[in-house]
Amino acid sequence: MRDRWAVILAGGDGTRLQSMTRTITGDNRPKQFVPVIGGSTLLNQTRRRVALSIESSRTLIVVTQKHQRFYKSLAEEIPRSLLLEQPVNKGTAPAILYSLLRIAAKSPRAVVTLFPSDHFFADDEEFMSHIDVAIDAVEVQPETVMLLGITPTTPETEYGWIEPQPSILASVQKSITRVSKFWEKPSLTLATSLMSRGCLWNSFVMVGCVDALLKMIRAAMPEMYAAFAAIAPAYETANEHKALAELYSQIEDANFSHQVLAVRPEDLMVMRVGDVGWSDLGEPNRVLSTLARLGVQSELAMSAS
């Protein structure tokens, strides 16, 4: 059995939600450090969710240094080796590559699950049961990377969509298929068509063996992979901060969905996830619709009305 590891991506700036999060905190902190729904921050909700299946001692959290005042208490709570501080936010691809290389150095046979830190699930236990199944599937087919796709309830135009190929593995509750292609923020007409033909919302949660994930990134972004691999000897040494700062000053912003997943569908499978009350809280209207679905009265809803 392979070691289970997790990466929580918490380095984004969350600018699209700042007008709303400012109502809660009085400042411009990124949404992952804000109690948008419920009494704890989205990041802490994600940490608790992940801990249902993966040990906290094997969970890396990727942050950005300019947000340090917002994760100060976290830095005091967890071992320093589990908090990966990027010099600046350069997008999801560098954050993921950096974290995977750190894990590979510790546990080269690890199965890694990648989690955004700003999503909401009404049923954490049900969702994490799908993670358990995905991990088991990846152990059987270690060369593949598994995305978790959410069964859509509306023709959402602000989400990414996954178009699956016909099912090759199925059970009564779970369905696993290969990925055909991705659709990013489709028109309403296209989203309606995607929904009618069984396409899925892309949760951006994915599971893979660390070597398979790194192989996929290397194939899609060889120059960036080489740049991060070149400074790997500095990881967890006194030189890491300087090496990262120099590297991040040279690389361009890079989006993992667009520049890795979209160009490597042949490496990917998708697991169909049913109704777990999922929402990507990237836009104010999604927060308000989630609050309405939960029947929650809040200052956010009142201020928007």
Where in the sequence are the language-model features?
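Conserved N-terminal catalytic core of the sugar/cofactor nucleotidyltransferase
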Residues: 1-11, 16-23, 27-30, 35-132, ...
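A conserved hydrophobic position in a structured secondary element of the catalytic/binding core
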Residues: 63, 115, 186, 208, ...
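Conserved core of the sugar-phosphate nucleotidyltransferase
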Residues: 124-248, 268
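A short acidic, often aromatic-flanked loop/helix-cap motif at beta-alpha or helix-coil junctions
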Residues: 41, 89-94, 154-156, 187-189, ...
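Left-handed beta-helix
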Residues: 1-3, 208-305
